[in-house]
């Protein structure tokens, strides 16, 4: 029965969108997964997609899937680059991972225009500026 399924709470795992400079000194944006737990997370799958509307027309991006074998304790892992041209969309990241034999999953959504200058802070876990998902 559905009521008998235990769904564990996701703790100390989050996402950030960072602003970086490449070797040509051009601005780039990247999405990272941060594991702030005292233990690794295993067999991590991240499904990303963008959706919303612009000028009254529905828009959506491709759905991408990323596999991370292990994200060690107190580290981060690069998921994907992200283009500023999709910041006006909902940018959704569905993260699933294992701790031992227990699966955990959580949906993270950066709502339209939340990835902006006003929301940029220093992300100490990765030593970069970006927008941290709460």
Task: Label every PLM stretch briefly.
Residues 22-31, 75, 79-80:
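Contiguous beta-strand segments within globular domains
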């Amino acid at each position: 029965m559905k009521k008998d399924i235990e769904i564990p709470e996701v703790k100390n795992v989050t996402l950030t969108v960072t602003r970086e400079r490449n070797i040509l000194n051009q601005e780039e944006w990247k999405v990272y997964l941060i594991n702030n737990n005292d233990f690794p997370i295993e067999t991590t799958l991240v499904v990303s997609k963008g959706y919303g509307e612009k000028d009254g027309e529905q828009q959506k991006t491709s759905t991408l899937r990323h596999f991370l074998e292990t994200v060690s304790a107190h580290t981060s892992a690069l998921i994907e680059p992200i283009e500023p041209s999709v910041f006006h969309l909902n940018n959704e990241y569905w993260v699933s991972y294992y701790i031992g034999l227990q699966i955990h999953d959580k949906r993270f959504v950066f709502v339209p225009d939340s990835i902006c200058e006003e929301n940029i802070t220093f992300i100490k876990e990765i030593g970069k500026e970006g927008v941290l998902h709460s």
